[in-house]
Amino acid sequence: QVILTGYVEFFRGTPMLVQAMFFYHGLRPFFQWNALTAGIMIISINTGAYMAEIVRSGIQSVDRGQSEGALSLGMTRVQTMKYIILPQAIRNSFPAIGNQFIINIKDSSMLNVIGVVELFFQSSSIAGSTMSYSATFLITCLVYLCLTSIATILLNIIEKRINNPILR
């Protein structure tokens, strides 16, 4: 419990930019990974901390009477969690889970500090070579907007499916 709390607090309480620098440069003597691998690791670990907190709050949002009722019907704690609590918790948490996914798309731009070639990095290179900063970064904004819009549409479809008892 203490280790998990420390993990969540550390990664939620420090900027991803600093985490990326620490993982890539600070741990380089111990791990020989490239920038992309370090970037994927830091986004995954950072997201894991936020997702743990989202799921925890989702579980706590389920009325205590639900688990008491399941236990009184003879279900085990594992069955209660699997069949009663988690389905409701995921349904309650899905908007926050979707928001975290959208944030990940946008936060990937921070990985350019460790040399990951991504959209922002490419845009900066193009803008520097063409001296057309306004147009280049406007296009970059539109690409990010398209990516997040597509993700939002897909997440809304999934959320409707989750909330519709006929489609489940």
Residue ranges and their predicted role:
Residues Q1-R168:
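Transmembrane alpha-helices and adjacent helix-loop boundaries
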